[in-house]
Amino acid sequence: MNENLWKICFIVMFIIWVFVRKVYGTRAMKNKSKKKVRPNFEKSLVFLNFIGMVFLPLTAVFSSYLDSFNINLPDSIRLFALIVTFLNIGLFTKIHKDLGNNWSAILEIKDGHKLVKEGIYKNIRHPMYAHLWLWVITQGIILSNWVVLIFGIVAWAILYFIRVPKEEELLIEEFGDEYIEYMGKTGRLFPKVV
């Protein structure tokens, strides 16, 4: 398949992804914050992820600066990644729908915050993070570019491994034994195998 066609496919998926986040994110942002945990370095990590999930992929699409890092992956692998991305956007939409107004881009507890344990959250505590792992991997494969793939994965891994323990600590503080019990029944990124 023509390289420009892959770029168009990626842009279509990217626009849908941004649209879903905008629709649900705007609704969720209307809820006021009750408690925020914002370590100083987290802004830097979020910015690093912006570079990995937005800036570099769009640079790969709209310029030739990263062309020397192209991988030349077979179309079959890129097509598989595109299908996974399409399904992953469906997952992303479901995650946002299940979370409702409880979603936040930062670590915070909102007024009226509820512990969501229904829908996809019945079996997985952090499906949004599972989605983002898939996103950074598949965008690098679709665009067939080492920089997009590796930078996206590394930037996301750093944020993920620093943020998740702090997020779970915040949720234990807010929901106590209910969250601890929930942790025992669910997996972080995948359903728990008993």
Curated annotation (Swiss-Prot):
Residues that coordinate or bind substrate: 163
Catalysis: reaction(s): [protein]-C-terminal S-[(2E,6E)-farnesyl]-L-cysteine + S-adenosyl-L-methionine = [protein]-C-terminal S-[(2E,6E)-farnesyl]-L-cysteine methyl ester + S-adenosyl-L-homocysteine
InterPro entries: ICMT_MeTrfase, Isoprenylcys_mtase
Spans traversing the lipid bilayer: 2-28, 38-62, 74-98, 126-144, 146-166
GO terms for MF: protein C-terminal S-isoprenylcysteine carboxyl O-methyltransferase activity
EC number, as in UniProt: 2.1.1.100
Gene Ontology cellular component annotations, sorted alphabetically: plasma membrane
Cytoplasmic compartment segments: 29-37, 99-125, 167-194
EC category: transferase
S-S bridge residues: none
Membrane topology: Multi-pass membrane protein
Extracellular side: 1, 63-73, 145
Record GO biological process: methylation
Binding site for S-adenosyl-L-methionine: 108, 113-116, 121, 126-129, 167
Keywords: Cell membrane, Membrane, Methyltransferase, S-adenosyl-L-methionine, Transferase, Transmembrane, Transmembrane helix
Cited Pfam families: ICMT
Main location: membrane
Subcellular location: Cell membrane
Family named by the database record: Belongs to the class VI-like SAM-binding methyltransferase superfamily. Isoprenylcysteine carboxyl methyltransferase family.
Role played: Carboxyl methyltransferase with activity toward prenyl lipids. In vitro, displays activity toward N-acetyl-S-farnesyl-L-cysteine (AFC) and S-farnesylthioacetic acid (FTA), an analog of AFC.
Name of the protein: Protein-S-isoprenylcysteine O-methyltransferase
